[in-house]
């Protein structure tokens, strides 16, 4: 790689040579220190100036230099800032030589005594300094140097150094995932890991990534869902299971979609769609309570998570909106209706597909407050149980908040004969051009033949969930390293 260095970058490399001539180790292997900056502030910030002077608290710490001015440095570590005072007349010559060669971005070790300045700022009066890692790049200015969104994503490590709000987002993401685990662990769910590489495509409607498994001389898919192996575990006697893991869908990128994302799927024996709606609502409210959030501001909307989540039947909502009865519509009339509203009817479409397209066109945009939409057509729900009152529809629901879908749940289909027929229908769709349709998974059908107890299941996209609770409108803002086009 031919790297053209800026003037500042050249100067910093020249400083390395000067430091080495002074016998300074430029890149240390490790160092021991007393307290990190956060702990120092927590422990000593309440002390008065006189208390610190009287007791002479000596300690060492480390951090990245973010400010150099006169006789002061400001260090940053783990999101906190801490001032260092350099008593130039008292410091040993070797430390003065080191100070002259320090730059913003360098990581250093400092030992000294705690004090407070005239303005009351907790400060470490240095008596020893050590360079731990020399920064050869110039950090961008927080307000003017890192405004390009693509550059922020491409150099996320720099983004994290200079933008505190970005750091807070990812700390909160980690906390949300921990809360999800806490919620399900407290309910005695078992966390499991299932294979990322799958020989059969299934568990969701999505285009896959395909890879070659050399040892088996076969093509495998990167999983598009964890549903089928998790339900096999319920067959095997684990009544409550969940998995948090990476999912891969070879599809487009937009503000709410990334080809690689994190999801949680959870399954509970002797539950159903109603039970999953209740469980999912309780999970969202649990997270909000733990984060001390009563309302959420997202995508320009104020979301109230305290109230009971609304329940809305998909077809009944459309019937009211369009003034027709979609329960009784013929396929020919459905195609005419689709054409009227500029919906492309694919070769594999049936009435259920058109109903779903109409829902996405007319209803989704109005689903602001938390709403469970239920009663999905069987054609788009190959793994969900048929509704007893109308077998053309299923006991399935999706949770919408702020016009976005966050969770998909249903009463699981436990009948292996029906499941095989549904898989065959999916395969027929695939043969007729639906790249997102499932393949026939005979191994899963065999698992059902051993007996799957009545089961409810749900999947949630964790990245979207984090977007909701951090008020970020782009999924890239909640992914540490989002996928980007090559420069």
Curated annotation (Swiss-Prot):
It catalyses: tRNA(Lys) + L-lysine + ATP = L-lysyl-tRNA(Lys) + AMP + diphosphate. InterPro entries: Aa-tRNA-synt_II, aa-tRNA-synth_II, aa-tRNA-synth_II/BPL/LPL, Lys-tRNA-ligase_II, Lys-tRNA-ligase_II_N, Lys-tRNA-synth_II_C, NA-bd_OB-fold, NA-bd_OB_tRNA. Mg(2+) 2 binds at residue 405. Its EC number is 6.1.1.6. GO terms for molecular function: ATP binding; lysine-tRNA ligase activity; magnesium ion binding; tRNA binding. Pfam families: tRNA-synt_2, tRNA_anti-codon. Keywords: Aminoacyl-tRNA synthetase, ATP-binding, Cytoplasm, Ligase, Magnesium, Metal-binding, Nucleotide-binding, Protein biosynthesis. It is found in: Cytoplasm. Its cofactor is Mg(2+). Binds 3 Mg(2+) ions per subunit. PROSITE patterns: AA_TRNA_LIGASE_II. It is an enzyme of class 6 (ligase). Mg(2+) 1 binds at residues 398, 405. GO terms for biological process: lysyl-tRNA aminoacylation. GO terms for cellular component: cytosol. Belongs to the class-II aminoacyl-tRNA synthetase family. Homodimer. NCBIfam families: lysS_bact, PRK00484.1. This is Lysine--tRNA ligase. It comes from Mycoplasma mobile (strain ATCC 43663 / 163K / NCTC 11711). The lineage of its organism: Bacteria, Bacillati, Mycoplasmatota, Mycoplasmoidales, Metamycoplasmataceae. The gene is lysS.
């Amino acid at each position: 790689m031919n790297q053209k260095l800026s003037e500042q970058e050249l100067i910093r490399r020249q400083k390395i040579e000067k430091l080495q001539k002074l016998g300074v180790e430029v890149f240390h292997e490790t160092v021991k220190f007393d307290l990190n900056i956060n702990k120092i502030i927590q422990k000593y910030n309440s002390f008065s100036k006189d208390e610190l002077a009287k007791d002479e608290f000596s300690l060492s710490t480390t951090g990245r230099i973010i400010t150099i001015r006169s006789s002061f440095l400001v260090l940053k570590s783990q999101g906190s800032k801490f001032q260092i005072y350099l008593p130039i007349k008292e410091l040993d010559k070797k430390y003065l030589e080191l100070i002259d060669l320090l730059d913003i971005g360098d990581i250093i070790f400092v030992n000294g005594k705690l004090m407070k300045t005239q303005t009351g700022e907790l400060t470490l009066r240095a008596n020893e300094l050590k360079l731990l890692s020399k920064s050869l790049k110039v950090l961008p200015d927080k307000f003017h140097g890192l405004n390009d969104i693509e550059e922020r994503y491409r150099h996320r490590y720099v983004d994290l150094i200079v933008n505190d709000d970005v750091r807070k987002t990812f700390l909160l993401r980690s906390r949300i995932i921990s809360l999800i685990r806490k919620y399900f662990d407290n309910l005695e769910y078992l966390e499991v890991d299932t294979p990322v590489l799958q020989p059969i495509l299934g568990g969701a409607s999505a285009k896959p990534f395909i890879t070659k498994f050399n040892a088996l001389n076969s093509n495998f898919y990167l999983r598009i869902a964890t549903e089928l192996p998790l339900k096999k575990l319920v067959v095997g006697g684990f009544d409550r299971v969940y998995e948090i893991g990476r999912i891969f869908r070879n599809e487009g990128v937009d503000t709410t979609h990334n080809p690689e994302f994190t999801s949680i799927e959870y399954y509970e024996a002797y539950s159903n769609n109603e039970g999953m709606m209740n469980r999912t609502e309780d999970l969202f409210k649990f997270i909000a309570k733990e984060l001390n959030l009563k309302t959420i501001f997202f995508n320009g909307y104020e979301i109230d998570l305290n109230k009971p989540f609304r329940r809305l039947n998909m077809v009944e909502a459309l019937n009211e909106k369009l003034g027709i009865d979609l329960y009784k519509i013929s396929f020919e009339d459905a195609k005419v209706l689709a054409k009227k509203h500029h919906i492309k009817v694919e070769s594999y479409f049936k009435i259920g597909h058109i109903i779903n397209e109409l829902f996405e066109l007319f209803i989704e945009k109005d689903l602001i407050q938390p709403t469970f939409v239920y009663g999905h057509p069987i054609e788009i729900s190959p793994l969900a149980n048929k509704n007893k009152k109308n077998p053309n529809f299923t006991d399935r629901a999706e949770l919408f908040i702020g016009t976005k879908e966050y969770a998909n749940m249903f009463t699981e289909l436990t009948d292996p004969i029906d499941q095989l027929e549904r898989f065959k229908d999916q395969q027929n769709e695939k043969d007729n051009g639906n790249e997102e349709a499932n393949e026939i998974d005979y191994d899963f059908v065999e698992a059902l033949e051993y007996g799957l107890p009545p089961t409810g299941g749900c999947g949630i996209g964790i990245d979207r969930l984090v977007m909701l609770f951090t008020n970020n409108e782009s999924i890239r803002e909640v992914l540490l390293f989002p996928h980007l086009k090559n420069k």
